[in-house]
Design a protein with these regions (language model features):
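Non-catalytic DNA-recognition/assembly elements of restriction-modification systems
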Residues: 1-48
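Glycine-anchored helix-breaking recognition loops at helix->coil/strand junctions
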Residues: 1-10, 14-19, 56-57, 103-109, ...
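Generic anion/oxyanion-binding catalytic loop in active/binding sites
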Residues: 26, 76-79, 123
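Flexible, glycine- and charge-enriched loops at secondary-structure boundaries
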Residues: 30, 80, 109
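Short, solvent-exposed loop/helix junctions and linker helices
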Residues: 30-34, 84, 128
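Sequence-specific dsDNA recognition surfaces
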Residues: 35-50, 55-89
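A short beta-sheet element
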Residues: 85, 89, 93-139
Length: 140
């Protein structure tokens, strides 16, 4: 049996650009317009120094790939060593090191806790997109 199939390869050093963001921005063709998520969201970066209230019990949020955002635990300010991010209802948050397994959450009325570790990226939606819709798209 003769194999007439040939496999073309490109050496890595010969590639012009191996940039996933560039690929998606320039190579995906759709009859619908595509826009950056950043155009419709606001990154929340302001941090609160919970350790400045050492005797107050602060309620901390967590995120899992099964549950999304959840009330994790409460901790006294004196036991917290870093500034945390305040998360209001409608905000989304994810851990950039675990987003690939679906570790993203949406804060709703179901979560009573209000702060999350600065290890998470927190953002809210502008009026141009519903946070529930964006959450479902990102979770899929």
């Amino acid at each position: 049996m003769v194999n007439n199939c040939s496999l073309k390869t490109v050496r890595f050093v010969d590639t012009k650009q191996w940039n996933v963001k560039h690929f998606f921005a320039t190579s995906i063709i759709s009859k619908y317009s595509t826009e950056s998520i950043g155009k419709h969201t606001i990154h929340i970066t302001e941090k609160t120094k919970l350790f400045n209230e050492p005797e107050k019990e602060h309620k901390i949020l967590g995120i899992s790939n099964e549950k999304g955002m959840f009330d994790a635990y409460a901790e006294l300010g004196k036991n917290i060593n870093q500034a945390y991010i305040y998360v209001e209802n409608g905000c989304l948050a994810y851990n950039p090191y675990r987003i690939n397994v679906g570790s993203i959450g949406l804060k709703t009325d179901l979560q009573k806790n209000e702060y999350i570790s600065p290890a998470y990226v927190v953002f809210k939606c502008k009026e141009t997109i519903l946070p529930e819709f964006l959450y479902l798209v990102l979770k899929s």
